[in-house]
């Protein structure tokens, strides 16, 4: 073994296997592409994205960590969302007031 070397197992890693998913139709109504990262509280994403923000409360994109989805102007997408886990607290972005999602 080489110091720092990592040995990976075989096969694909399945993420969010037990998470309750919802599907959301999203359209970028702006004139520039918008990217949304894997752990962004989805209702707080760019205001140019048109979707049911109330239904998406407490959810994030169902994509691997450190990745993003790019929404091109005028293009409709259907995305899969999963609940934010852990403490379910969101600070920063546009949540007013910031803090726990379930309070």
Swiss-Prot record:
The keyword Cell membrane does not apply. Pathway: Nitrogen metabolism; urea degradation; CO(2) and NH(3) from urea (urease route): step 1/1. InterPro entries: Urease_beta-like, Urease_betasu_sf, Urease_subunit. It is found in: Cytoplasm. It comes from the Bacteria. It is an enzyme of class 3 (hydrolase). GO terms for biological process: urea catabolic process. Pfam families: Urease_beta (PF00699). Gene3D superfamilies: Urease, beta subunit. It catalyses: urea + 2 H2O + H(+) = hydrogencarbonate + 2 NH4(+). Disulfide bonds: none annotated. GO terms for molecular function: urease activity. Its main location: cytoplasm. GO terms for cellular component: urease complex. Its EC number is 3.5.1.5. The keyword Hydrolase applies. Keywords: Cytoplasm, Hydrolase. Belongs to the urease beta subunit family. HAMAP family: Urease_beta. Heterotrimer of UreA (gamma), UreB (beta) and UreC (alpha) subunits. Three heterotrimers associate to form the active enzyme. This is Urease subunit beta. It comes from Mycobacterium marinum (strain ATCC BAA-535 / M). The lineage of its organism: Bacteria, Bacillati, Actinomycetota, Actinomycetes, Mycobacteriales.
């Amino acid at each position: 073994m080489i110091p720092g070397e990592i040995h990976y197992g075989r096969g694909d890693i399945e993420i969010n296997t037990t998470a309750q998913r919802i599907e959301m139709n999203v359209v970028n109504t702006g004139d520039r592409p918008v990217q949304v990262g894997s752990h962004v509280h989805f209702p707080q994403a760019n205001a140019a994205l048109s979707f049911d923000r109330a239904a998406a409360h407490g959810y994030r994109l169902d994509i691997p960590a450190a990745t993003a989805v790019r929404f091109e102007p005028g293009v409709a997408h259907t995305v899969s969302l999963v609940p934010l886990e852990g403490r379910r607290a969101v600070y920063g972005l546009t949540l007013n007031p910031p803090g726990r999602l379930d309070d």
